[in-house]
A protein has these predicted regions:
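N-terminal loops that bind phosphate or other acidic moieties
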Residues: 1-190
Length: 190
């Protein structure tokens, strides 16, 4: 089971990783606008979620942690990529409502709700972006949960699915292939 403390620590760790790799992600940013700010925007967005995590006790439920992260990210969202990231977390949070701890099936289902929320919010969803990476990750997580409900097993499948999907983004978006890069937002979610 994933505890609230583990989820809280994962949000903080993810924020630290994105911040550390911000420049690398900024340099990948060519779609939809080559303005080189995806890493910055996403680090600010998840950074807001990380800041909210600092106030939470070790014994908080996964529901409360997910809701606090999602609310803070929505308020702190910057740019298109940050808004999409916050929507993924908002849906993820809805998927974990009323959970004290989360098993693998709940984790995968929550991610799928997050993906659905993000796709619905984007006027013209484009494949080869963070949306694709998150969708494939959620699909891999759901398939893994059918085999083994262990959240670590499911999380590993989610991460592998995200990495696999990220590698395909240049095949789905010719502008990425031409530049020889993967999708910047997808890089963060992988």
């Amino acid at each position: 089971m994933i505890t609230g403390k583990q989820l809280r620590d994962a949000v903080i760790s993810g924020a630290n990783s994105i911040l550390k790799n911000r420049k690398f992600v900024d340099d990948l940013n060519i779609f939809p606008v080559p303005d080189g700010d995806t890493g910055t925007n996403m680090s600010m967005t998840i950074g807001a979620g990380s800041d909210a995590m600092q106030a939470l006790a070790d014994n908080e439920t996964t529901a409360k942690v997910a809701k606090a992260a999602a609310s803070a990210m929505l308020r702190g969202a910057r740019g298109n990529s940050g808004v999409i990231l916050s929507l993924l977390f908002r849906g993820f949070s809805k998927g974990l409502e009323d959970t004290v701890e989360a098993d693998g099936t709940q984790l995968a289902a929550a991610l799928a709700i997050g993906v659905d929320s993000a796709y619905k919010a984007v006027m013209k969803p484009t494949e080869g972006t963070i949306l694709t990476v998150a969708r494939v990750a959620a699909e891999k997580g759901a398939a893994a949960a059918e085999i083994d409900n262990d959240p670590i097993y499911v999380w590993d499948a989610i991460c592998m699915g995200a990495a696999e999907a990220l590698a395909t983004t240049p095949d789905l978006l010719p502008v990425l292939k031409k530049a020889g890069v993967v999708d910047a937002g997808g890089q963060v979610s992988a």
